[in-house]
Amino acid sequence: MQKILIAPWGNFSSWKKVIYSFNGVEKESKSSLSAIYDKINPDKVYILVLDTLSNLESENYGDIVKEVKEKTENFIKENLNIDNYEVIVCPGVGTFYNKDFEKYFKFYGNLTDYYSFALYELSKRLDGDLEVHLDLTHGLNYMPVLTYRVIKDLLEILAIKNKVRLVVYNSDPYVGREKEILNIHTVEDVIIKPSYDIKGMTLDFLDATKFVDKKEIGKIKKEINMNPKIKELRIMKQNINAFIASIVYALPLVYSTFFVKKDKIEIYLNELIGAFISNIKINPEDKILKRYLYFGEGFNSLVKAYFASKISEIPQLIKDELSLEEIDELKNTLFKENPNSQYIKNEISSLYNIINTKYKEEELSEILGNWTPIYKIRRENIDKFKIRNFLAHAGFEKSVTEIYISVENKNGKIELSEKTSLRYNKNYIEEKNGIKRFIFKYKDKNGKVEEINILEKIEEILLNK
């Protein structure tokens, strides 16, 4: 299990050396990170700092990030004996007096952009079985609570498939005495349980802040709306939400058929990040930084969809059909802790029961070697689609799902084999330019055909849960 140490930092330029005491380790240092690092020996360290540490001497935001990163790295090299670290520069807000310039530096934007940006950056770096150590000692104002929320949100998704432990630290407050001993306390030490409560993705990825000149708002929004990748993302919305729903509601066939790969989602995320950064305006003379855009909940949900895709992908199970054996594998891995997995067990047990007790050998021979609608196997009529019914049957709704029966001889009796496969009726699946649609064509008793967009129904219930 890999050990990761994460720490949000405020302005480290004024930190003084003290003695930090942690579980038998005493370390004289300007940061609590030193003692924790020596004790736990992490594989990787991530330090989150704010762009508010910049001197704002360039109009280019890339220069601002580079400046802050170099400033932080120099502090680490000069004061802390740690290796294998990475500095992540996040957006910050506030007004700060800079003694060197004898001037107030002003950073305007939305405070929650810190959460969104840190969520995005850490989602790319966390994976596998993890032991995450979070040191909140040096976080400024909103940083500790938002960093904790980021870590918790990501780890609860990571725990769907991995073993995850979270340990949180904070030290005694520094009161200005030289050589004083500050104890580092363990605030929390927990095994993270998986959360399947992932929100569906809405279209509020980016919006204009109140700091934009009114005459610029229309231009900025048009720029976002006309962006080809963001336009494509809007079209992909139902596919992404179908994938999220497959995890939330434990729907094996929806997972395998409508899985959206992390690489595809990452392209959209990078495009949104690019739009966000390109609309940061800096006035080096007046020392003012303004963010014209802020991240909405749609962006946060997209990051979580990316992370869920990253941790949940089982390549051999991303396909249009699944055997009963493969469905059981999903039930015991991705959906192991999901309360909705009971529906999977019920449906598969029902199929075994129907085939093994209600079909004679000669009847089975007539349907072997063909894909057969489940409603016919159940000797029932096709029904109009109802989303609640779809979820209650783990996505194996009889009117849209087909079965390819395989049998085996058990003690002289022909029974259903775990090699039996399920899929959605191919006549209802459409794909164009990488976008899938799931359209059920239902004919009522009067012969009238109604087309039902199943992904739309899945999305509606996900967004309204």
Curated annotation (Swiss-Prot):
A Pfam family reported for this protein in Swiss-Prot or TrEMBL: Csx1_HEPN
Record's keyword annotation contains Nuclease: yes
Activity regulation note: The RNase activity is stimulated by cOA.
EC number(s) per entry: 3.1.-.-
InterPro entries: CRISPR-assoc_prot_DxTHG_CS, CRISPR_assoc_ribonuclease, CRISPR_Csx1, Csx1-like_HEPN, Csx1_CARF
Keyword entries, A-Z: Antiviral defense, Endonuclease, Hydrolase, Nuclease
GO molecular function: endonuclease activity
GO biological process, one term: defense response to virus
Family note: Belongs to the CRISPR-associated Csx1 family.
Function: CRISPR (clustered regularly interspaced short palindromic repeat) is an adaptive immune system that provides protection against mobile genetic elements (viruses, transposable elements and conjugative plasmids). CRISPR clusters contain spacers, sequences complementary to antecedent mobile elements, and target invading nucleic acids. CRISPR clusters are transcribed and processed into CRISPR RNA (crRNA). Activated by cyclic oligoadenylate (cOA) to endonucleolytically degrade linear RNA; when cOA levels decrease the RNase activity of Csx1 is abrogated.
PANTHER family recorded: CRISPR SYSTEM ENDORIBONUCLEASE CSX1, CRISPR SYSTEM ENDORIBONUCLEASE CSX1-RELATED
Subunit structure: Homodimer.
NCBIfam families (UniProt xref): cas_MJ1666, CRISPR_DxTHG
Misc. comment: Encoded in a type III-A CRISPR locus.
Identification of the protein by name: CRISPR system endoribonuclease Csx1
